[in-house]
Amino acid sequence: MALSYEVKEFSTFGKCVCIENGAMELYVTVDRGPRIIKLNLVGKQNMMFNDDALAIYHDEPNLQDMFGKGARWNICGGHRFWVSPEKHPETYYPDNAPVAYTVEHNVFTFYAPKQIFTGWQETLIITVDETEAKASVKHVLTNMSDRTQTGAIWGLNVTDKGGRAFVKQANEDTGLLANRTLMLWPYNVMTDKRFYMDDTYVGLAQDVHAELPFKIGSNNTAGVAVCLNHGTAFRITTSYLPGASYPDNGCSVEMYSCANFLEVETLSPLYTLKPGEACEHIENWELFEEDSADIKDLHKYFL
């Protein structure tokens, strides 16, 4: 099957650009967002969490003060483009306007409208492989405000219930100096059974019965994160820039788990952008059939 796409309604998210290549399905919202709301091997379940009821949102008074009366940010699910460090309400921009897009063969470009107040303009450029379950997701962040701003591109993959995510610990020989970062958030309970750590990997699982969230971050020098769910391995690779300043005390990857979903997040270095300047960050995606639940089988995804 050759690569093809059509625009159609999907769930409660409105119109989506629905891309298929015989191996993989990838849907992107264009009535809002954008969000990469569906990602799966053909015949397998969606790897992305979908909040079909639009029940998870922020509409606090300070958010409405900044973005307008009635403003509401919905998580929706799927992959989204944010800017780190996280701030409330600035980060929770209510991206509910239609998204312009272009298609050039296997390259799909989505232009979110310029954000009011922050002045950020976000563009997603998705290149889908012609025949294999692979895609490149380029994030371009442009400072369209009238002031210099500092931020990092933050790609958040909101994956479905039941998943487990892993990253490899940094193993560079730095002699007498520390070689890895492991950042913890205030709400973490360190005896939480969702959290996994051995000499090689750090992992986090999703549990629908969890009462508290759990979040960890690390300096992912290997540039690889893997999420296992629904008989599928979702591998995300990025470039790590040694010596660069990363958000959250040096994190280039973060994982967040709650009762609804599991997030696998990648971050670019922090960039200081003058008006009109832009930076970019690329995630490369691959999907594999994977039925093993044995951590010993993870190594093949980190070679």
Question: How would you label these PLM feature ranges?
Answer:
Residues 1-136, 140-303:
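Surface-exposed acidic/polar loop and edge beta-strand patches at domain peripheries
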